[in-house]
Amino acid sequence: MSFDTLDYLSPDAFEVRISELLVATSEGADALIDPSVSEVLRLVKDHLKMDVVFVSEFVDGRRVFRRVETRPGAAVIAEGGSSSLEEGFCQRVVDGRMPRLVHDVEALPNKAELPPTDFPIGAHMSTPIVLTDGRVYGTFCCFSFSANETLTERDLKKLEMCAQLAARKIDAQRAREFEQASANWRLV
């Protein structure tokens, strides 16, 4: 099944492709987050009809956008960009101050406590990326500019599965980097 011919309306096709990517290995990838995660972002964006999908890493009190996919004309964040953790929704999801699935951000009872954004956020879904050692790497997030009442708990489960894929890929890359550094250290 190729990326171009995938029927995004079919939940089964989406889940099958994510499962394929979960078991795939990235031989020799030199980026911390390998290309299969970018493909997953595109799948999520199209399948859930979101405007923006990204993987963020939490670094020194900041949220760094490591991979980003957007619909045409929706490039409101960029790979490599960052902001304070308190300026976004990610940290709030991780620590439980905000639900993982929000159909309409404007309708949240605690909307006044949320940080202002430079662009509208209607529907929002986010889940932590938890590494094998238990540390939270960051989050796997997506949002649309408009509210979306059609999102379901099953959609959130799909996002959680994608976060597991990202965690697996990050863990594998870190293990390769550690192995390489250890080999270099022994050679010196």
PLM regions and their residue ranges:
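Regulatory sensory and allosteric helical modules in signal-transduction proteins
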Residues: 58, 62-63, 74-114, 122
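Amphipathic alpha-helical regulatory segments at dimerization interfaces
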Residues: 26, 38-47, 92, 96, ...
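Helix-loop-beta substructure at the N-terminus of cytosolic sensory domains
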Residues: 29-68, 77
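Regulatory loop-to-helix N-cap segments in sensory/regulatory domains
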Residues: 2-8, 144-161, 170-177
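Helix-to-coil/beta transition segments that act as allosteric "coupling" elements at the rims
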Residues: 113-137
